[in-house]
């Protein structure tokens, strides 16, 4: 049994070698010749999986180690009788922590408290729900917009997008990309929406590039609209609008979900799905894969305020480390993918062990996802 895996999927060689012969290949572009005798293909979001790639090939199963699936033609796979699995929620924690890192940086730079801001969350799936929970743990007001969930009658106080635009100081997008249909998200943030944002608002896109109309956004910024922008995703990736990058406050190369934990979850989820597909079901404990953290233990005295939270968050991950490299190489062919391929190891907040002498600080840090314990001062 021959299994092709994206060369940038961590732990893929070790895990899938338990099931068959593993060949690691680049994800963009996939070497088509390798597909001629392969039984399974494991990809990431950079690989377009469709009829033109797989027609006439012996592939029986496709796995994507990503939460999003808009790069996969699921309807064609089903029609062709090819098994499929994604990894929903695998990188949700990472994306939430990316958003926090960005917001805390902007709050420090511009001198505002997040408690004084209302956050509008567009898309309340694995990422949006976790983001809502962490923001509300901090006492920050959130507004939710998710028409598909609202129409299904899912639990939640869902509002219209217009209401979020009117009332939110921060608008952050966490939707799939739907190019048509009743829940179309292509250019959901169009010129009209962008121009309608509150003065001084913050716009964040960490889902799919085309959810925000990049051309319209650049037009508004060029005209001097008072708006802070965080973009991790771009229309036309791996190409991007260099002029837009110059205008945004934070720009990164589609790495919001790139924690070691998130990548490992993605790989293990598709591994487990494929092992079940072939009748040799196996399960993997995530902590058996992850290396020891680089941190020892941190001692925190007193309550948790915003400056202290910012220091803890940025100790684990400061978004500026990914903004600067992109600006240096933007516009150079191949460099966007190279930044992603050679991405520095990044951990999640759970990797930081915090000893608190304040019980409320320890409790709050645990709610936020840190590994915190309370030890009263002696």
Curated annotation (Swiss-Prot):
What catalytic activity is recorded?
A: 4-phospho-D-erythronate + NAD(+) = (R)-3-hydroxy-2-oxo-4-phosphooxybutanoate + NADH + H(+)
Cellular component terms (Gene Ontology)? cytosol
Q: How does it assemble?
A: Homodimer.
GO MF term list: 4-phosphoerythronate dehydrogenase activity; NAD binding; protein dimerization activity
Domain of life of the source: Bacteria
Supply the PROSITE patterns for this chain: D_2_HYDROXYACID_DH_1, D_2_HYDROXYACID_DH_3
Which residue positions are annotated as catalytic? 208, 237, 254 (proton donor)
Protein name per Swiss-Prot or TrEMBL: Erythronate-4-phosphate dehydrogenase
Q: Which family, according to UniProt?
A: Belongs to the D-isomer specific 2-hydroxyacid dehydrogenase family. PdxB subfamily.
InterPro entries annotated for this entry? Answer: D-isomer_2_OHA_DH_cat_dom (IPR006139), D-isomer_DH_CS (IPR029753), D-isomer_DH_CS1 (IPR029752), D-isomer_DH_NAD-bd (IPR006140), Erythronate-4-P_DHase (IPR020921), Erythronate-4-P_DHase_dimer (IPR024531), NAD(P)-bd_dom_sf (IPR036291), PdxB_dimer_sf (IPR038251)
Residues that hold substrate according to the record: 45, 66, 258
Q: Which GO terms describe its biological process?
A: 'de novo' pyridoxal 5'-phosphate biosynthetic process; pyridoxine biosynthetic process
> Which organism does this sequence originate in?
Escherichia coli O127:H6 (strain E2348/69 / EPEC)
Q: In which pathway does it act?
A: Cofactor biosynthesis; pyridoxine 5'-phosphate biosynthesis; pyridoxine 5'-phosphate from D-erythrose 4-phosphate: step 2/5
> Mind listing the UniProt keywords for this protein, alphabetically?
Cytoplasm, NAD, Oxidoreductase, Pyridoxine biosynthesis
Enumerate the residues binding NAD(+).
Answer: 146, 175, 232, 257
Quick check: keyword Cytoplasm in the entry?
A: yes
Gene that specifies this protein = pdxB
What is the role of the protein in this entry? Catalyzes the oxidation of erythronate-4-phosphate to 3-hydroxy-2-oxo-4-phosphonooxybutanoate.
């Amino acid at each position: 049994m021959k299994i092709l895996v994206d060369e940038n999927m961590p732990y893929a060689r070790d895990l899938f070698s338990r099931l068959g012969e593993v060949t690691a290949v680049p994800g963009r572009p996939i070497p088509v010749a390798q597909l001629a005798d392969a039984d399974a293909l494991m990809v990431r979001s950079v690989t377009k999986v469709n009829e033109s790639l797989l027609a006439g090939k012996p592939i029986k199963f496709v796995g994507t180690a990503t939460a999003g699936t808009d790069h996969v033609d699921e309807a064609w796979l089903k029609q062709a009788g090819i098994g499929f699995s994604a990894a929903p929620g695998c990188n949700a924690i990472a994306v939430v922590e990316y958003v926090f890192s960005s917001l805390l940086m902007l709050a420090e730079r511009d001198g505002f408290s997040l408690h004084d801001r209302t956050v509008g969350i567009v898309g309340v799936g694995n990422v949006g729900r976790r983001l809502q929970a962490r923001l509300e743990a901090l006492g920050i007001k959130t507004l939710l917009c998710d028409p598909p969930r609202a129409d299904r009658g899912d639990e939640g106080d869902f509002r219209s997008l217009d209401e979020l635009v009117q009332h939110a100081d921060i608008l952050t997008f966490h939707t799939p990309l739907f190019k048509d249909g009743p829940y179309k998200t292509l250019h959901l943030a169009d010129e009209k929406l962008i121009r309608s944002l509150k003065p001084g608002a913050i716009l964040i896109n960490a889902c799919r590039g085309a959810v925000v109309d990049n051309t319209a956004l650049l037009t508004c910024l060029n005209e001097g609209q008072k708006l802070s922008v965080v973009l991790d995703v771009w229309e036309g990736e791996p190409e991007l609008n260099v002029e837009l990058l110059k205008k945004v406050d934070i720009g990164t190369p589609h790495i919001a979900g790139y924690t070691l934990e998130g990548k490992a979850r993605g790989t293990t989820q598709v591994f487990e799905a494929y092992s079940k597909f072939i009748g040799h079901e196996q399960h993997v404990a995530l902590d058996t894969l992850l290396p020891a953290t680089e941190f020892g233990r941190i001692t925190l005295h007193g309550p948790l305020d915003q400056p202290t939270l910012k220091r803890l968050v940025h100790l684990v991950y400061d978004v500026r480390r990914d903004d600067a490299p992109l600006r240096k190489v933007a516009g150079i062919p191949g460099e966007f993918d190279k930044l992603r391929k050679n991405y520095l190891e990044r951990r999640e907040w759970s990797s930081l062990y915090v000893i608190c002498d304040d019980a409320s600080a320890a409790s709050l840090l645990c709610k936020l996802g840190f590994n915190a314990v309370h030890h009263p001062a002696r």
